[in-house]
Amino acid sequence: MVIIETPIFTKRLLGVMSDEEYRLLQLHLLNKPDEGTMIQGSGGLRKLRWSAKGHGKSGGVSIIYYWFVAQDTILLLFLYAKNERTDLTSEQLQQLKKVIEGEYP
């Protein structure tokens, strides 16, 4: 399986997780790509809650990703701290959906 990051994901990742924390997240997704909760009306986007910097799940981050089963690929789209927001807006979801449709029509 391959994991691909969008530029915005990479930018937001810096300073939120250490390299080791990120490696553990990647391993988790490789072993359980369907772990994230499916976001209704998003075309298959998933949201995974992940602890960051020893704060536990309540102080962690939410990872938005898409699992392309046929291509055996996970596309990491967006990440945000839980104290930053609770959910994405419908406009943000539509923008992420367009990324998926553009990458894998």
Give the ranges of each region predicted by the language model.
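Amphipathic alpha-helical transducer elements in NTP-driven molecular machines
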Residues: 19-22, 58, 93
